[in-house]
Amino acid sequence: YGGPLTVDDLPIDQHQFIALVAPRPIFISGGEYIEGNGVPGTNSRYSLENWQDTPGTFMATAGASPVWKLLGRKPLANKALGLSFDNVPDPVAVKARMPSPLTPLIDGDIAFRQHDQGHVDAPNWPTFIEFAGHYFKSPGFKN
């Protein structure tokens, strides 16, 4: 080994972890980068909320999306915008196609939405409820 193992020693990437959920529905969310006082001990101008790496989260979500199609389910998509991630994506192209914050991609069985309020979940709850309503038919959900 030559030293302690780190995350860099893992022979996997996040899209592979996400793909393990397929073909079950999954909703992945994150917040937008927020300008802040910086990360202590660095020259970063972004606040601590930015450690979540929403662009990387989106790239991992899009990278896992083809597995849903392979298993006969709907890939990551927003039909109104003409966005669909049903092929093995090129990471650079995926990052370029990342939708602006507050744009839900909930037309597939794998879903993503970025809100504009940093590292919290509450702003994405209404979109999650709408996504979950595609699968749960009860009075509390819009169908």
Task: Describe the predicted segments one by one.
Residues 20-26, 105-110:
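Short, proline-enriched alpha-helix->beta-strand connector loops that line the catalytic pocket
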Residues 29, 76, 140-143:
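Residue-level signal for secondary-structure boundary elements
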Residues 23, 32, 63-74, 134-138:
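Short, well-ordered loop/turn and helix-capping segments at boundaries between secondary-structure elements
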Residues 22-52, 115-117:
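Conserved strand-to-loop "acid loop" that flanks and positions the catalytic carboxylate
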Residues 17-18, 100:
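FAD-binding beta-loop-beta segment adjacent to the flavin cofactor pocket
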Residues 1-17, 47-93:
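Mobile cap/lid helix-loop segments that gate and shape the active-site cleft of serine hydrolases
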Residues 77-122:
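Histidine-bearing beta->alpha loop at or near hydrolase active sites
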Residues 113, 123-143:
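Catalytic active-site module of serine/aspartate enzymes centered on a nucleophile-bearing elbow/loop
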